[in-house]
């Protein structure tokens, strides 16, 4: 599941959070947006990417908005320069593109690895060029957010949030342990394999 553009999502924080939790893909075209909606400097792409949303780059009306023969490469080049993206960021964005694509499973396995469908940490680092530590960071934070939502739904959210606020500023592992200590009463959820 994905949508094109989605640049107004930065103004709707609660909806943005739901997109993050469900990892709904956002395919954004900064060059097109630059001409039609927002200048590159105001484009929310880097903010959405840094927050862990499933964003990728795309083209939109390449004959109108692009100057080169390879519109998608142009989008990647402009995004890298404009948003100060690292090569690891670029690899993650490209991986997201394959994940969001409508290509057949065989194609995705070729570019992401045999077990990619199990989750981000199962993508083959040698194929995606996304370091395992980055994939683990993204996957673990997503799983922790899902745990928190499950605890809130089970009416344990207040006490857990209070305990987390008490330990605010501590290492992420402290928050992870607080969530895990409160989780045994809950049913399992799909993201547990990412912890």
Segments the model singles out, each with a brief description of its role:
Residues 1-4, 47-55, 76-89:
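Structural recognition of alpha->loop->beta junctions
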Residues 10, 27-29, 33, 40-49, ...:
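Hydrophobic alpha-helical bundle architecture
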Residues 51-71:
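Short acidic/histidine-rich active-site segments
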Residues 10, 78, 84-194:
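Mid-to-C-terminal alpha-helical segments outside catalytic/metal-binding sites
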Residues 4-6, 38, 65-69, 83-87, ...:
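Hydrophobic alpha-helical scaffolding
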Residues 13-19, 36-46, 65-78:
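Histidine/acidic-residue-rich catalytic or RNA/ligand-binding cores of hydrolases
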Residues 1-37:
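Active-site core of metal-dependent hydrolases
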Residues 30-36, 59-62, 75-82:
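Short beta-alpha connecting loops at secondary-structure transitions
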């Amino acid at each position: 599941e994905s949508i094109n553009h989605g640049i107004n999502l930065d103004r709707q924080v609660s909806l943005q959070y739901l997109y993050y939790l469900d990892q709904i893909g956002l395919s954004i075209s900064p060059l097109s947006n630059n001409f039609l909606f927002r200048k590159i400097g105001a484009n929310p792409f880097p903010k959405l990417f840094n927050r862990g949303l499933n964003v990728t780059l795309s083209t939109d009306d390449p004959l109108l908005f692009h100057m080169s023969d390879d519109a998608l490469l142009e989008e990647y080049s402009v995004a890298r320069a404009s948003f100060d993206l690292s090569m690891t960021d670029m690899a993650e964005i490209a991986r997201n593109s394959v994940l969001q694509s409508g290509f057949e499973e065989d194609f995705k396995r070729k570019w992401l690895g045999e077990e990619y469908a199990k989750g981000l940490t199962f993508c083959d680092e040698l194929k995606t060029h996304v370091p395992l530590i980055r994939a683990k960071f993204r996957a673990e934070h997503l799983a922790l957010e899902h745990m928190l939502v499950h605890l809130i739904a089970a009416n344990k959210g207040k006490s857990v949030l209070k305990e987390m606020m008490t330990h605010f500023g501590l290492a992420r592992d402290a928050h992870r342990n607080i969530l895990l200590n409160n989780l045994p009463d809950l049913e399992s959820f799909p993201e547990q394999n990412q912890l």
